[in-house]
Amino acid sequence: MVTIRLQRGGAKKRPFYQVVVADARFARDGRFIERVGFFNPLAAGQAEKVNLDLERIQHWVGQGASLSDRVAKLVKDASKAA
C-alpha cells in the first residue's frame, strides 16, 4: 500500500520533515517514490513553514495512496490557504 507521510530530517532537537510518497513497508526515513513537499515546524520569521505540491498529492490519492494523519491535516490547511 502506498502512503503519503512525513520523513524526518534535520538535526537533533531541530526537526525538518519531507512529505514523501512511499510504500508502507519502507522504513520511515528510508526509500520513497516521490517527494511532494516539506514541513518545517520550527520555521521563524519569513521562513516558509509548509510547501506542498497539492496537484501531485491529488494524483497519488487518485491512484489509491492514503494520507497519514499529520499529512492529511497539513493538506487540509494548505488547500484552505490556497
Swiss-Prot record:
Keywords: Ribonucleoprotein, Ribosomal protein. Transmembrane segments: none annotated. InterPro entries: Ribosomal_bS16, Ribosomal_bS16_dom_sf. GO terms for cellular component: cytoplasm; small ribosomal subunit. GO terms for molecular function: structural constituent of ribosome. It holds the Pfam family Ribosomal_S16. GO terms for biological process: translation. NCBIfam families: S16. Belongs to the bacterial ribosomal protein bS16 family. PANTHER family: 30S RIBOSOMAL PROTEIN S16, SMALL RIBOSOMAL SUBUNIT PROTEIN BS16M. This is Small ribosomal subunit protein bS16. It comes from Tolumonas auensis (strain DSM 9187 / NBRC 110442 / TA 4). The gene is rpsP.
